């Protein structure tokens, strides 16, 4: 029997690999001769960098970059030496969690630190990039990131237009001659799970701006500024990605990646499953095990476990899911390629007790053992 395990992290309790290894131990208790492969799993959002560092023998690279409100922040990315790949989350450098609610200012917030992370990875030798862009604090169209990478944004007086959302309307000329030449050799894949265009009522400012501090009175102003920036970009580069699905992601960062860096935007789970080479292991798998901290209706809507399950079904494998907790709505997962799912809790306890790492590991192992005794 070949068993492939790819389970998302149980946030605050077990990492993806820790959960996978706990399941492996349980399977081996029931099936000592089983061939078992454990792969890291994430959806391109929070925790993706950590999952791939741990699951693909990566190295954590710590660095100090310019934060969203221009003060230095500690950020990090993953370095996968074998493939010269950098795995990073823009939120590490310009995330909304780095900005207290009372200091949010979309007119000033910058993505400059994201560009600094990319520069650092390029200098280290990385030529492949996997970048998650969820959880941003910015609405600057990616101007900050691009400035860090060498692009100049000039106003009508041919001086620097500044940074943040306030700079967008001032841009009169764009000079890309200083763009880091190493980017010509780079292949950038962006994990993007939103389809919003750059501008308009479904664009970045109107949909995501309010959570970043955009007031009702600022929406029209910032959206028009974003459209102006897109127009100057199109005039300069001869491309138009303004209405491309995902262009509005991360305050227009999606647009910047498409227009200036030749990146591809891919649903997060698809990108991660490809990066970890999961499908290659599924061709001869008998059973696939997946799961996450909580199985519910959102899981069935296409979160990481369902992505694994659907891929497994292409190869006719049975799919089992384990979770810390399971809601009534999780029954929808059975219609989304998960054959059976099981909560791992074994007795009534507090949330803190359930999330204790040692307890969760023991529960995961015990549940896996009992389930696999039936197979």
Task: Describe the residue ranges of each PLM region.
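N-terminal loops that bind phosphate or other acidic moieties
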Residues: 2-133, 137-375
């Amino acid at each position: 029997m070949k068993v492939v395990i790819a389970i998302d992290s149980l946030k605050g309790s077990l990492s993806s690999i820790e959960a996978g290894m706990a399941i492996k131990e349980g399977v081996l208790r029931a099936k000592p001769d089983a061939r078992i492969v454990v792969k890291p799993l994430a959806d391109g959002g929070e925790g993706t960098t950590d999952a791939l560092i741990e699951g693909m023998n990566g190295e954590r690279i710590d660095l100090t970059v310019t934060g969203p409100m221009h003060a230095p922040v500690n950020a990090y990315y993953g370095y996968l030496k074998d493939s010269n790949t950098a795995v990073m989350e823009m939120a590490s450098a310009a995330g909304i969690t780095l900005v207290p609610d009372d200091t949010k200012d979309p007119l000033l917030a910058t993505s400059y630190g994201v560009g600094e992370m990319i520069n650092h990875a390029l200098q280290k030798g990385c030529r492949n990039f996997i970048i998650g862009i969820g959880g941003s604090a910015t609405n600057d169209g990616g101007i900050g990131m691009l400035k860090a990478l060498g692009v100049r944004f000039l106003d009508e007086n041919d001086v620097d237009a500044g940074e943040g959302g306030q700079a967008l309307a001032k841009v009169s000329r764009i000079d890309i001659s200083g763009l880091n030449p190493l980017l010509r050799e780079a292949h950038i894949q962006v994990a993007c799970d939103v389809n919003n265009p750059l501008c308009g009522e479904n664009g970045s400012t109107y949909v995501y701006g309010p959570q970043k501090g955009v007031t009702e009175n600022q929406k029209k102003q910032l959206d028009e500024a974003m459209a102006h920036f897109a127009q100057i970009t199109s005039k300069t580069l001869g491309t138009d990605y303004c209405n491309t699905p995902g262009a509005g992601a991360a305050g227009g960062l999606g647009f910047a990646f498409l227009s200036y860096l030749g990146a591809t935007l891919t649903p997060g789970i698809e990108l991660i499953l490809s990066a970890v080479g999961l499908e290659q292991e599924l061709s001869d798998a008998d059973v696939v095990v997946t799961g996450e901290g909580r199985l519910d209706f959102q899981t069935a809507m296409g979160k990481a476990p369902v992505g694994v399950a659907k891929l497994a079904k292409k190869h006719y494998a049975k799919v089992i899911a384990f979770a810390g907790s399971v809601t009534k709505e999780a029954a929808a997962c059975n219609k989304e390629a998960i054959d059976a799912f099981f909560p791992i809790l074994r007795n009534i306890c507090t949330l803190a007790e359930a999330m204790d790492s040692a307890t969760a590991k023991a529960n995961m192992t015990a549940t896996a053992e009992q389930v696999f005794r039936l197979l």
